Design a protein with these regions (language model features):
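A short core secondary-structure module
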Residues: 64, 68-112
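Short Gly/Pro-enriched turn/cap motifs at secondary-structure boundaries
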Residues: 46-49, 73-76, 90-92, 118-125
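Active-site pocket-lining segment
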Residues: 203-226
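Internal helix-loop-helix
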Residues: 1-35, 75-82, 94, 223-226
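A short, Trp-centered hydrophobic/proline-enriched beta-strand micro-motif
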Residues: 34-43
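A structural signal for short hydrophobic beta-strand segments in well-ordered beta-sheet cores
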Residues: 56-59
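Glycine-rich beta->alpha junctions and the first turn(s) of the following alpha-helix
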Residues: 89, 110-211
Length: 229
C-alpha cells in the first residue's frame, strides 16, 4: 500500500517533468520535494481508462479553463495536494482532444468523493475526485492543448515497470511463504513439499515469477537506452 502511494505521487507529477514549463517544474517539483503529495486523475466512472471517452471537460474562458467532471479509483485522491487531471478540450477529436492540467487541491469546486473499501492494498488511499466549475489558470495547462493523450502514453511507458516491480515483489513473497508452508505441513508422515502435485504447483509459480522478472529487467534496460515502445 505504501509503495502504491509513493509510486502514484511520482505518477502524478511525471507529466509536469515530461512536458511542463520550467516554471511548472520549479513550482510543483519544489512542493513535492517538501513532502506534498500528488495524484494522477485519468480513470472515470463510465469510461474507465479509455481516454477517447473522457467525459471530464475543460472549457477555455479568457485566461482560465473551467473544469467539470468526476474521476474514480484515484490513488492518493483523498490525500493529494496536487492533481494532474486529464480533461477533454475538443470532444469531437476523441483521444486526440485530451489535455492535461495541474489542479491544486484547495481550488474552489474540488472535492473528494467516496473512498473505496478495497480487498487489498488498503493502506493506499483510493477515492473519487470531483471537479465542479473549477477555475484554473491557463498557465496550468501541461504542454499544449489537445496533447494530453500523447503525454499520457509517454507517462505510462515510463511508469508501468514500477508497478510491475511492486507486483513482482508481492509474488516473490507469496512463493517464499508457499515453499515454507509446503516444507512444514506434514501429511501421512511427509512434508507436502515432497508430493508431486505440490512440486508441480511450486514449479509453475517459480517459472511465472522468473519470466516476469526477466521481462521487468528487459523493460528497464530498454528504458535505460531511451526506448519506451
Amino acid at each position: 500500500g505504501f509503495a502504491s502511494s509513493f509510486a502514484a505521487s511520482t505518477f502524478g507529477i511525471k507529466p509536469v517533468l515530461l512536458a511542463g514549463t520550467e516554471e511548472q517544474k520549479k513550482a510543483y517539483g519544489a512542493r513535492l520535494a517538501e513532502g506534498q503529495i500528488s495524484a494522477m486523475c485519468l480513470t472515470e466512472p463510465q469510461s474507465g481508462s479509455d481516454m477517447g471517452n473522457t467525459k471530464c471537460r475543460a472549457v477555455k474562458d479568457g485566461d482560465e479553463y473551467v473544469l467539470n467532471g468526476t474521476k474514480c479509483f484515484i490513488t492518493n485522491g483523498g490525500i493529494a495536494d496536487i492533481y494532474t487531471v486529464a480533461a477533454s478540450t475538443s470532444p469531437e477529436l476523441g483521444s486526440a482532444g485530451i489535455s492535461l492540467f495541474i489542479v491544486d487541491r484547495n481550488t474552489p469546486g474540488v472535492s473528494v468523493g467516496k473512498e473505496e473499501d478495497k480487498l487489498g492494498i488498503r493502506t493506499s488511499n483510493t477515492t473519487d475526485v470531483i471537479f465542479q466549475d473549477v477555475r484554473i489558470p491557463a498557465t496550468n495547462l501541461i504542454g499544449e492543448e489537445n496533447k494530453g493523450f500523447a503525454i499520457s502514453q509517454k507517462l505510462l511507458a515510463r511508469t508501468r515497470p514500477t508497478g510491475m516491480a511492486s507486483a513482482l515483489g508481492v509474488a516473490q513473497r507469496a512463493l517464499d511463504l508457499a515453499v515454507d508452508y509446503a516444507q512444514q505441513r506434514v501429511t501421512f508422515g511427509k512434508p507436502i513439499a515432497s508430493r508431486q502435485a505440490i512440486k508441480f504447483k511450486l514449479a509453475d509459480m517459480e517459472i511465472r515469477l522468473q519470466t516476469a522478472r526477466a521481462q521487468l529487467f528487459y523493460n528497464a534496460q530498454q528504458i535505460d537506452k531511451g526506448i519506451y515502445d
